[in-house]
Curated annotation (Swiss-Prot):
Molecular-function GO term, any one: metal ion binding
Cofactor: [4Fe-4S] cluster
GO biological process: dimethylallyl diphosphate biosynthetic process; isopentenyl diphosphate biosynthetic process, methylerythritol 4-phosphate pathway; terpenoid biosynthetic process
Keyword list, A-Z: 4Fe-4S, Iron, Iron-sulfur, Isoprene biosynthesis, Metal-binding, Oxidoreductase
Designated gene of the protein: ispH1
Active-site residue list: 134
Annotated Gene Ontology cellular component terms: cytosol
Top EC category: oxidoreductase
Entry EC no(s): 1.17.7.4
Enzymatic reactions: isopentenyl diphosphate + 2 oxidized [2Fe-2S]-[ferredoxin] + H2O = (2E)-4-hydroxy-3-methylbut-2-enyl diphosphate + 2 reduced [2Fe-2S]-[ferredoxin] + 2 H(+); dimethylallyl diphosphate + 2 oxidized [2Fe-2S]-[ferredoxin] + H2O = (2E)-4-hydroxy-3-methylbut-2-enyl diphosphate + 2 reduced [2Fe-2S]-[ferredoxin] + 2 H(+)
Binding site for dimethylallyl diphosphate: 47, 82, 132, 231-233, 276
UniProt name for this protein: 4-hydroxy-3-methylbut-2-enyl diphosphate reductase 1
Described purpose of this protein according to its UniProt entry: Catalyzes the conversion of 1-hydroxy-2-methyl-2-(E)-butenyl 4-diphosphate (HMBPP) into a mixture of isopentenyl diphosphate (IPP) and dimethylallyl diphosphate (DMAPP). Acts in the terminal step of the DOXP/MEP pathway for isoprenoid precursor biosynthesis.
Length: 322
């Protein structure tokens, strides 16, 4: 039997779960522990099939709209980490549903910023991807027409505001830092008085994971991003790897998704994971490579992370006796 070829694995750090994802998953699990099954969840709690399937097995029921929840239920309904339009909690209240809000606090920060700009009479631009649940939620914080979506640099070049001197912008939290910087620069060049966030809206986890990929992608033959196709931050990581010159940059939800022909002649491989992807899948993929190669593993770090977001009050441990 011939010896397995050597393969250098470069793990990107940080990778995987962020504080907002941990909070969202813990919210569902704590609700199941405290109230029992079922617990309804509006939209995927985070964009990861492995996580969602695991919660389904524990008794979570995922729906896209509140109308899918039985009228007579007393079970809790959890709003996903991506945030929801204001109409959703209002609808839940009108139906006397018991709701738990697992919206990431950094998304809530964007909602607050938009509300402040609206109160001050500013026309608001939202930099983001249409149809993404986070963008739908942010647009739904204010009356229709109060926020204009900007998706591309071309949009930023051509948009015509009502009053160029009374503008503000906010952004989706999971965008490409480079693409967003280009759009923001164009807006500031065209509208020097535009108001932006005091601290950028792209979240720390998105930024750190992209910076780690920027370090690793130029020095490996291939890079795998563990993540789901509908995960915005995971897709951006793959795009960053391609942009930094990595010859093979792929997105994979599980080891079974990998096309092994693409990795036959590589000698080095980078691995990262989107903010909603669990470390167990990284380990699964490394095990799959270990069956075919002799691995030599190292880690490249771009930042240290120690962020923590408290759970919704109703499911905090101290609320157990309530």
């Amino acid at each position: 039997m011939s010896a397995k070829p050597d393969l250098k694995i470069v793990l990107c750090s940080p990778r995987g779960f962020c504080a907002g994802v941990v909070r969202a998953i813990d919210t569902v699990e704590r609700a199941l522990d405290k109230y029992g099954a079922p617990v309804y969840v509006r939209h995927e709690i985070v964009h990861n099939k492995y996580v969602v399937d695991g919660l389904k097995k524990k008794g979570a029921i995922f729906v896209e709209e509140l109308a899918e929840i039985p009228e007579s239920t007393t079970a809790p309904v959890v709003f996903s980490a991506h945030g929801v339009p204001k109409s959703v909690p209002a609808d839940a209240q009108s139906r006397n549903l018991f709701s738990l809000d697992a919206t990431c606090p950094l998304v809530t920060k964007v909602h607050r910023e938009a509300a402040i700009h609206f109160k001050r009479g500013r026309e608001i631009f939202l930099i983001g991807h249409s149809h993404h649940p986070e963008v739908v939620g942010t647009l739904g914080q204010l009356p229709v027409g109060a926020v204009t979506l900007i998706e591309t640099a071309e949009d930023a070049k051509t948009i015509t505001p009502k009053d160029p001197n009374n503008l503000a912008f906010v952004t989706q939290t999971t965008l490409s830092i480079d693409d967003t910087a280009e759009i923001v620069a164009l807006l500031k060049e065209r509208f020097p008085n535009i108001n932006g966030p005091h601290k950028e809206d792209i979240c720390y986890a998105t930024t750190n994971r992209q910076l780690a990929v920027k370090k690793v992608a130029p020095v490996v033959d291939a890079l795998i991003v563990v993540g789901a196709p509908n995960s915005s931050n995971s897709q951006r990581l793959r795009e960053v790897a391609e942009r930094e010159g990595c010859p093979i940059a792929v997105l994979a939800q599980r080891a079974a998704d990998l096309d092994w022909k693409r990795f036959e002649n590589i000698t080095s491989l980078g691995i990262t994971a989107g903010a909603s992807a669990p470390e167990v899948i990284v380990e699964e993929i490394m095990d799959a490579f270990a069956e075919r190669f002799t691995l030599h593993v190292e880690t490249v770090s771009a930042a240290e992370e120690n962020e923590f977001f408290p759970l919704p009050r109703q499911v905090r441990p101290e609320a157990a006796a309530e």
